[in-house]
Regions:
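Beta-barrel outer-membrane channel/assembly domains of diderm bacteria
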Residues: 1-104, 128-168, 173, 202-206, ...
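Outer-membrane beta-barrel and related beta-rich outer-membrane complex signature
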Residues: 63-67, 116-122, 178, 235, ...
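Catalytic Cys-His active-site segments of thiol-dependent hydrolases/isopeptidases
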Residues: 107
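Internal alpha/beta core interface subdomains
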Residues: 123-128, 176-194
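Surface-exposed cleft-lining segments at the edges of enzyme active sites
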Residues: 194-197, 241-244, 282
Length: 342
């Protein structure tokens, strides 16, 4: 059993960004210092299985870096909840099959991107959008009750292999206000669908994800698809592209992602790229989400003088309503990670 803690402090601001997320506002654009603390518990009964629980606390608000689903500036480490400690992960994973080629995941608090392979070697740990590989519709980090299964071709470690992932997560209206899937009207300690919806009701925020991928020795590619119902949402969408689906709406999201990295760390960077398209159907009233698309390209270097450290640069566009006459924002980030101790 292992208990791992992680404390994050973030100093920053978005000039001209309002407290309600509206740009060009007179207020809400000042510099702030926020914090987040995570405690991860990992335990195993057989050495091959995993029971994971995570507690979090923080003081972020929804904007400009926090938990709103339609927040393009959202950071990865942005727990809110007024420094209250809450449980936001609880699931169990175990292998199946003679060669452990299947892995089953089941739990009350699990996220689809953590039980699915996102083919990317760009890891900045800064802007949330780039952690989805540019496909925030398929890999939307839905959090709630769920089940998933993974099959990986049973070959020797490091050999090219096929990978298939299937999972379903319920992330409806009862998600935790402290969690980064809360869409409003939520309360600490709850997640997923409540008893008024049930886990299989179309209004409970169903996220059904399927993926087929291939892992080469130094490259990988995957095609993904997600079906979403009322209360599910595209991650970090711009404006109405990121709000939860209204009653009667459905979302069919598709994505293609891939990466390549050199065999040895040096001046040649690894490259990761992804594209996603989200088709929203069904009648609703405004402000309902619309069909959207997103993409990203990320480069990451491991310096030849110190392979434990890394630098990276990424560019992309978050999910923006397809054909919309409004702005089509671009996101750019650069980072350098330095390990200060061993």
């Amino acid at each position: 059993t292992t208990l791992k803690g992680e404390a994050t402090f973030i100093l920053g601001g978005v000039p001209g960004y309002g407290a309600n997320g509206a740009p060009n506002s007179k207020g809400g654009g000042q510099t702030t210092l926020n914090d987040e603390l995570r405690l991860n518990l990992y335990t195993s009964f057989s050495g091959k299985d995993l029971l994971r629980a995570r507690w979090g606390a923080g003081n972020f608000s929804s904007y400009p870096f926090g938990t709103s689903s339609s927040n393009i500036f959202k950071l990865i480490h942005t727990e809110n909840g007024n420094e209250q400690v809450f449980l936001d992960r609880l699931y169990y994973q175990f292998p199946i099959g003679e060669h452990n080629q299947f892995k089953l995941s089941i739990g009350a608090l699990m996220r689809n991107n953590e039980i699915t392979w996102i083919p990317s070697v760009y890891h900045s740990d800064v802007l949330d959008f780039f952690s989805t590989g540019g496909s925030s519709g398929v890999y939307n980090k839905a959090l709630g009750e769920g089940v998933g299964i993974r099959w990986k071709q049973p070959l020797r470690a490091g050999k090219p292999a096929w990978v298939v992932n299937l999972n379903a997560i319920v992330s409806g209206s009862a998600v935790s206000s402290g969690s980064d899937s809360c869409t409003g009207g939520c309360s600490n300690g709850a997640s997923g669908a409540d008893s008024s919806d049930g886990i299989l009701n179309a209004g409970s925020g169903i996220n059904a994800l399927a993926q087929v991928g291939y892992q080469g020795e130094n490259w990988g590619v995957a095609v993904g698809y997600r079906f979403g119902t009322t209360q599910s949402a595209v991650r970090t969408g711009n404006g109405v592209a990121g709000v939860p689906l209204a009653t009667g709406q459905q979302d069919n999201s598709v994505a293609i992602n891939g990466y390549w990295h050199p065999h040895h760390a040096g001046w040649i960077p690894s490259i990761s790229s992804g594209f996603g398209y989200n088709i929203v159907s069904g009648s609703s009233t405004a402000p309902a989400p619309q069909s959207s698309r997103s993409w990203m390209v990320g480069l990451q270097w491991s310096p030849p003088w110190e392979t434990a450290h890394a630098a990276g640069l990424a560019i992309g566009q978050p999910a923006n309503a397809a054909g919309a006459t409004g702005s089509s924002p671009w996101l750019v980030e650069g980072f350098y990670g330095y390990q200060v101790s061993n």
